[in-house]
């Protein structure tokens, strides 16, 4: 994945993943460590839930779905295709292959 891709580029790509995180989320830290060792097959961007206002305003259904962190949204060509609650590498991979 190219470094520094903005969330807009991820969402507009053929297949991209946005992961919502929080500073106090231990599962988010664990997932980030796992994904740094074993990257996913699609471009990905991490967004702190406090900084997701623009994303949420463009994708209100995604915003309304966010509950258990880390929370992943799988996008394709500007459309939300799938969400993954309490995301793990395995759950995200399953959603990508669905």
Which positions does each model-derived feature cover?
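Eukaryotic short linear interaction motifs
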Residues: 26-27, 53, 92
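Short Fe-S-cluster ligation motifs
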Residues: 53-69
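Short, glycine/charged-enriched secondary-structure capping and boundary segments
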Residues: 32-35, 60-61, 87-89
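Thiol-based oxidoreductase modules, predominantly thioredoxin-like and allied folds used
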Residues: 3, 20-21, 40-57
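Local sequence-structure signature of Cys/Sec-based thiol-disulfide redox active-site neighborhoods
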Residues: 2-40
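Residue-level detection of beta-strand scaffold positions
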Residues: 17-20, 43-46, 74-75, 80
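Non-catalytic, surface beta->alpha helical segment in thiol-disulfide oxidoreductase systems
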Residues: 68-98
């Amino acid at each position: 994945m190219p470094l520094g891709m903005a969330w807009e580029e991820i969402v507009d790509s053929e297949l991209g993943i946005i992961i919502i995180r929080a500073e106090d989320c231990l599962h988010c830290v664990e997932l980030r460590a796992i994904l740094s060792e074993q990257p996913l097959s699609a471009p990905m961007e991490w967004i702190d839930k406090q900084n997701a206002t623009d994303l949420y305003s463009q994708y209100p259904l995604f915003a309304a779905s966010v509950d258990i962190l880390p929370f992943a949204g799988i996008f394709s060509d500007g459309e939300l295709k799938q969400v993954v609650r309490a995301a793990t590498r395995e759950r995200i991979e399953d959603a990508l292959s669905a």
